[in-house]
């Protein structure tokens, strides 16, 4: 560290510092060697200089002697006078120097000048005198800059991409040959070439502020260097390797604020005019730590404080009393090189002659103010073109070839024609021969060409004129090829569409240009969309191959072709299938049981089967697909239980119905060549659920169509529901195998009779029986009533339905096996209850008229109601709904209104009873027996009636007639029962010849309802025997079972439904085949409760139960009187 002790007053030091800086400014203005001038200027030289003697100073005269151009003499004299006047003003006590002088009285006369090792000449910031000097010396240049700004702006807009900037406006002049440390600005995508304007957009706030001050100081020179990474967006250079080392010295001719349309941030648009090639010598990147420590360094930044106080004298009164130290001022004002030289002068007077040869270690930098903005700065070296022979045949030939190419391009491209004309005009104004400016011609060729970044930068870096011309000719040839190709495309399109309309011509031309140039027409975006979809999918190898093939086809087809749309739709479906995606299985049995119990009452078999399914999956660690079929009457919850199962298993749910389906394409899809072709329902389910293991509910599978011109859908379901085949299900549209082995299929049906046998074999059937009265009461109380109250808006109101009302509703109105009809009636009851509640509330709230009421109050209330009505009508529909909801909430909190629906007032809500009695017959006559039948609606009672068509008579052939819309099976059963009854009666009571003399008519009530089934044999036989024995059957006995000709009782189905129907009909004894005894034991206790079972193996077991009090004598003598009359008549005849 250099330390120098001097003894001088503060005014002398300030004068010395000011003089040194003044001469530096003159050296910069004169564009001479700053190093040499600074080496001749020392503290001793200017220590005794006075303002009036500045020009007569020996150092100044020596400097004048070095200047060769006399035009600077008058200019320097004016600058010297300005400095003198300013220096005189500083001695009046109004400037910072006077304050410093007064402050120095408090300090010692001996001052230590201790510059810090880190401080250099470059840290000196120009003072106000520098600004005066710069403004005076560049006055003429600023005029040229302002005049060229408009011209440059017009030229840059003509071809902003190439940046040629050709303009008729004269370029800025008076550029310093040697420029100090300057701002470095990175340029993206294209380098700048000397002599051609270029507009750049700056977004960095620091750079924008620096450029503004540069323009204010009239030092608008920067170094522009192209970024190596064209995608990088920055306005500062942090690393020398980020840019190319060769750039241009550019002058900012104009700058104006702008705004980024995308981000909305404030930016600056600057118009640059490059002057010459330069090369980075040293880079000073922005110091980020300096920004953070700027506040801390504020107290030590003495130079900044001095300059601000000098420019604003009024602010000195409010300045903090902490005045910067004298050492700091001296350090900032006296560079290291001068202090070193001053030390050497004080040491010896003999070495003063050697000062001319001293090279200063640091550049004198009048642009020191740029460091305040923390931007990237550079020291540069000027690059001069290598000398060349103007008469060189190679250079002349290259020049001629470039001119030839320009001529050819101008004939093909009008934009080039205008640029070439402008360039020719500028050349002619400077010289009459273009061959004298080959370097400028090469730069122009590169500036207007759309070449690659590396190629253009290579041209800029070439200092050999011959090489530069060769490279420029190469990029210009490429430009010619592009122009020729564009012209060829234009001609080809014109040939194709000569006879077509103008609109079609333009469209075809656009297509041709896009096809030749490879411009995206939407297909690339579509292809990218499909490729992006499959990134998250796990496509099988076979599917991946098909996808790649279809993508290749799509990329080669025109968008207007019909096949393009077919392939696009196909790829859309192919990429919409969730290949490899599975929802996470839920193996918690308590959670699944809780969900199933919340949604449905009873259904123990279904719930146990689902819990078994979960248990097996938990043990195996995986769950394979199953096919379950729920069979039961309507309204028992087959479809809703499917949703609950999906929720319990944490699977997606999809439902579609096949009832009435006659087209196999609904299952397997259409061929994609057909217009409007779509995949089948199964593929659509996978797309919607976006998992390969959803729960798919196939509803009404028993009502699917069978055969036809469009195929058999039930046969198509075989592949879907077969566990051995559905792992490679083939959809006609996609035509690729799809794995359905993880899908859980749930089918619903009302009957198994109409389901094809092969399809039924592939399903696991679970029968859902109807509900008994006790079950219905629980369902109504726990599910139906709360739901109906909520839908009617009476959820929290005192409107209740008693249990006896629910029981009466089921007994007299809703006798079906399910609860759908019961739900409808309950909802109807609560809607009517809501109406009553609203009416009661209106009556309670309406004002009662009295003699004491005043007319004014009535009028005001009416006006108020009218105003409320008007304001309510102006509100939106949503507001009205909210208001209604608020009124209902107020109704719910009303304790005065209490509505109870009981058995007594039930008919006020649902009308008179539909069923007046529990049974059709309270007392059955002979020949009438209650049978039990199973239908799609569940179990029901089926009465069989047998009567004599006429009194017993002598006939050779007794007659038997049956009615009631019986099916073929029941007709066969009735004929069999008639024969069995004749045989059984003859064996049991041989003297009873009833069937020999009787004409019997058998009928099943409700003749409009078709009846069929093999379970009414015992009922018909009992009806015949009851008529033959003239014995009534107990009306509380119900029976079911098929009968053989010998009296064997055969097994039947639907025992649970029939038992429920018997109990619902008031039966107390139920007779069924002995083979169904196990089914009876599996019935719930609430179903068996109140029923006495009789499991009959032979019909004799039934006869003994029903006719146990009929002995042989009584049975033989039932029709004894009629037989005697008929015998006597026969003997008489």
Curated annotation (Swiss-Prot):
Major place of residence: mitochondrion
Chain spans, region Disordered: 98-176, 282-358, 844-889
Lon proteolytic domain residues: 923-1109
Transit sequence range: 1-37
Stretches with biased composition (Basic and acidic residues): 98-117, 125-143, 282-301, 325-340, 853-889
Low complexity bias locations: 145-166
Entry's EC annotation: 3.4.21.53
Sites where the protein binds ATP: 632-639
Region of interest (Dispensable for catalytic activity), residue spans: 839-892
Entry keyword Nucleotide-binding: yes
Positions of the catalytic residues: 1015, 1058
Family of this protein: Belongs to the peptidase S16 family.
Designated name of the protein: Lon protease homolog, mitochondrial
Species in which this protein is naturally found: Saccharomyces cerevisiae (strain ATCC 204508 / S288c) (Baker's yeast)
Protein encoded by which gene: PIM1
